[in-house]
Amino acid sequence: MNISKTKSVSLVYEDLNKIVNEIVSKQFRSRHPDGDSDIDLQHLFSIINLKNPENDNDATNKQFVLTSIRDDTIHVNRKGDIMHGNLDMGGNFFVTNVNDKEMNPPDTHAATVGYVNRKIASYIPKANLNIICSQGFKGKKGITSRTDDIYKFFPAGVVLPTDAIIEKISLTTTNDTVENSKHKLTIKISDPLNSGDVQTETVFEKLGSQLYFSQQFRKPVGNKKISFQLDSFVDSAPVAIFAGESTLTLEISV
């Protein structure tokens, strides 16, 4: 399977695709004694253009995000024609107030912009992706129902390859802030070339006492941008989300 032939869905990603395809091709040519090939996409982030929020006069600071990511943040192992990858988002959310565009106001959720949003999933032809988020989703006390207080993550916009289908979605938590809370997981599916084409659908609701919840969710999402949103409530009032570790697992087939 020639990963380097993967084509861009959006012109925005065209140059990035060429660079990543070259990286992936070179990595594939380096085989381990056990016959498997490891693809480390860590240095993919070195080409991401993010401003340092502490000094808006800086042209760019490519190391700003790099220094916040552990070496094993993204590591994909290839076995045969199937690759299994873990995207460890732990620590990423401690990088706040990142400007993803010049002159834009700081965005506390922009730490995910430029990570998963760079079509990493497009280079994984068949995979189970575990989006691991360690202590990244602590809510704010006394939040309101205003749109800008809604927590969005898991991740901030993956564009999946052609014919990709989400087969199953699972959510695991170590503990919840409030035992009798209810958590509603919503998926947003949009066309990366048409911002007006957006579908929103509830995946499932789980109670705070349920540490694991899994749902069959057969949904064609090829060439679409997906993101997830988790809202937590106690007696219909929004509450802080998880104090512990949360893992969202997507089972994807193509």
From Swiss-Prot:
Name the record gives this protein: Uncharacterized protein 385L
